[in-house]
Amino acid sequence: CSALTILFLYLTIVFFAKRLVKSSEDGTYTPGKAIAVFGSGAVGALAYCFSDTFWFSAVEGEVYALSSLFTAVVFWLILKWEEHADEEGSDKWLILIAYLMGLSIGTHLLNLLTIPAIVLVYYFRRHDFSWKGVCAAFGVSVAILAVILYGIIPGVPTIAGWFELLFTNVLGCPFNTGLAVYLVLMATALVWAIWESYRVIEIDGQLETPTIVSFVLAMALAGVPFIKESALIGILLIITMLVVLFMKKDVIPARWLNTIAMMVTVVIIGYGSYAAIVIRSNADTPMDQNSPDNVFSLKYY
């Protein structure tokens, strides 16, 4: 993991060096410029490689090596998106970043700190510089962090717990029935939201009522609006989303909703790595801290 981290750091430095050192008209570099570009990448990557902090995190059996790899990869991916942003299908890079973000949740939350940098790269690629725009980009990055940290991560087990209580305590169903129903409903809602938005894109790109309803339902079941595990905040945010989307349905492109729905879906898939914790706990291993063998104990794990 640490070796690959250095590789992606090298590629990142080379990317920025190429922006500073102009190539010839045919895209080639003179020997001196090539040494400057690739040499700067090698020097920067190797300097980080042999630094005390990185070296000793690389040789110990901890989560930081994999976390560093996720950090290096997602930032390199946003640079790849920046290169191909005007091409058709460039959103695939953003979706891959979201998937790796979801996977990184199961490793270490440190990787989420790349979100502000990623949002700024997106902003400077799509818009001209202005201080107002930069502040807005920072605001969007904070909102994305809040959605993941205080929405999706605690929201999924919280909503699963509500379903579990309903099906077990009220309806008298077997244990874990509510969890199974919730997972099926969430997956169905996400697929519906993606399909509806894609269907509209194929027609004229204008939002329709089924598109908005499916999107808001998918976001709700994914835990996005339930900030701090609060049902009241969740309901208010759901109503706000519905009002804004219906009022701005002629302005907001369906492609945005399609991309957001796919990104939330892959984040949930990556977040699913936590299923290993529940499976391991149900095996009654000798080391089983907090015994997270159900959705209620998993929430506080």
Language-model features: where?
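Membrane-interface alpha helices of multi-pass inner-membrane proteins
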Residues: 44-46, 93-107, 217-226
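Membrane-interface transmembrane helices that cradle and orient dolichyl/undecaprenyl
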Residues: 17, 29-35, 74-94, 101, ...
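Transmembrane-helix motifs of polytopic, lipid-linked glycan transferases
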Residues: 1-28, 73-77
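Transmembrane alpha-helical segments of multi-pass membrane glycosylation machinery
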Residues: 1-10, 33-40, 44-52, 68-72
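Transmembrane-embedded, aromatic-rich helix segments that form part
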Residues: 110-122, 154-158, 231-238
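Aromatic-rich transmembrane-lumenal/periplasmic boundary elements in polytopic membrane proteins
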Residues: 258-301
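Short acidic/glycine- and proline-prone juxtamembrane loop motifs at membrane-interface regions
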Residues: 53-64, 110
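Membrane-interfacial entry segments at the cytosolic side of transmembrane helices
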Residues: 128-139, 171-181, 202-212, 230-233, ...
